[in-house]
């Protein structure tokens, strides 16, 4: 997605470099504040020189991506299991529970964090277009709006929860009616 933004538009990408300059004892806090400002500005690229901040940010994004993908994948597994084995909610329910858990955790921890709209940029063609000549081993974040993926993520989880709840309710009613007639 980030690649398309640079190639399809003629505008020069906006970027900010967080330099690794330790001029005080609270340099790391200053780096974090600078990163927060850059994230809020929704720049096309953020170049992070300080290795500790770059690693922490990269891991935070990775965990958010993992939660998002796990929620979608387990939601789809739950939907498919609910459709294939209509009378066995025991198969779909654990996948649905994991999907709902991951969606909830993502919503609480990542949804309102501006960092969730960035991805670690590894595409060489995109990186070549950035002026990175005087930067040493940076982590580069590329802006990638994710509102559509968040809606997909939530929709899959909620649909799987609704289908799973209906399946459990239907199985419960069958059990009650079969126990009452016997």
Swiss-Prot record:
Protein name in UniProt: Transmembrane protein 11 homolog, mitochondrial
Free-text function comment from the UniProt entry: Plays a role in mitochondrial morphogenesis.
Membrane topology: Multi-pass membrane protein
Species of the source: Drosophila melanogaster
InterPro entries referenced in this protein's UniProt entry, alphabetically: TMEM11
Compartment(s) where it occurs, according to its Swiss-Prot or TrEMBL record: Mitochondrion inner membrane
UniProt keyword terms in alphabetical order: Membrane, Mitochondrion, Mitochondrion inner membrane, Phosphoprotein, Transmembrane, Transmembrane helix
Family designation: Belongs to the TMEM11 family.
Name of encoding gene: Pmi
A GO cellular-component term linked to this record: mitochondrial inner membrane
One GO BP annotation of this record: inner mitochondrial membrane organization
Taxonomy of the source species: Eukaryota, Metazoa, Ecdysozoa, Arthropoda, Hexapoda
Transmembrane segments: 70-89, 91-108
Main location class: mitochondrion
Pfam families from the UniProt entry: Mito_morph_reg (PF14972)
